[in-house]
Regions:
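Basic, flexible Lys/Arg- and Gly-enriched helix-loop patches that mediate nucleic-acid binding at interfaces
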Residues: 1-256
Length: 256
């Protein structure tokens, strides 16, 4: 591809054709995956379609494509051929669960941008059942450093017993080790942390270390989630009040 000004000149000189027809407007939109574009007598190669995957990151795997120390990374779980893939956002090494992987840089950037407030749901496995007060504080926002607090979140009890509990926490922000810092601030005995949902995409029964392609409907759902500036995310729209901690009737979310 040439520089912008040279491309504009080629268009104005009638050198560019789309499906055999001369194009003279520089702003003309084309779909290179469907339409045939030629410059002079040379046809432009079709662009490789983007790929979108859901990956169940195991504990101990780093969310990076290379580690100088030789520790396991997500790269070893990705296809060796096809478009260049990269993870969307990060999960700590000691956190498991859903990680989106794609070759679509623009969509990935939007999904990570705080402007769009994409909700993410985590399952917190606790070694002791939490008090109602602790759950209420978790939902209202937690101060984990002077002047630094989490925003209101959605809290649900997935399972609860004498020896522990599983709590579903949905947040629409992504500060460094935020969920773990929230638990530490409330003295919640966190045994394990797993992300089970990102926006409309659910982890479901995807096995640890497994990778599955997203459906067209799921990709559309992600694009819809980042179309235009969102005034608020799911977690902010449904803040939990002291009496508003919800109990889930079923088990972990299932992929639909």
């Amino acid at each position: 591809m040439a520089a912008r000004r040279k491309c504009d000149r080629l268009i104005q000189d009638g050198e560019v054709r789309v499906d055999g027809e001369v194009v003279r407007e520089p702003g003309t939109r084309v779909d290179p995956d469907v339409q045939r574009v030629t410059v002079g007598k040379r046809a432009l190669p079709r662009l490789q379609a983007h790929a979108y995957f859901a990956f169940h990151k195991p504990v101990g795997v780093l969310t990076t494509m290379h580690d100088p120390g030789g520790r396991p990374t997500v790269k070893s779980y990705l296809p060796a051929t096809g478009p260049r893939l990269f993870p969307v956002g990060r999960l700590d090494g000691d956190t498991s669960g859903l990680l989106l992987v794609t070759s679509d840089g623009e969509l990935a950037h939007r999904l990570m941008h705080p402007r769009y407030e994409i909700p993410k749901t985590y399952h917190l496995t606790l070694s002791a059942p939490p008090s109602a007060r602790a759950l209420a504080r978790l939902g209202m926002g937690v101060e984990f450093a002077p002047g630094e607090s989490s925003r209101p979140a959605r809290v649900e009890t997935v399972r609860r017993g004498r020896e522990g509990a599983v709590i579903a926490l949905t947040i629409a922000e992504g500060r460094n080790r935020q969920v773990r810092r929230m638990c530490e601030a409330l003295d919640l005995p966190l045994l394990a942390l797993a992300r089970v949902r990102v926006g409309p995409i659910e982890l479901g029964d995807l096995a640890a270390g497994a990778l599955r392609p997203l459906t067209g409907e799921e990709v559309t759902g992600l694009r819809n989630a980042v179309t235009g500036a969102r005034a608020s995310g799911e977690a902010r729209r449904k803040p939990v009040t002291p009496g508003g901690v919800r109990r889930s009737r079923g088990g972990p979310p299932r992929r639909r």
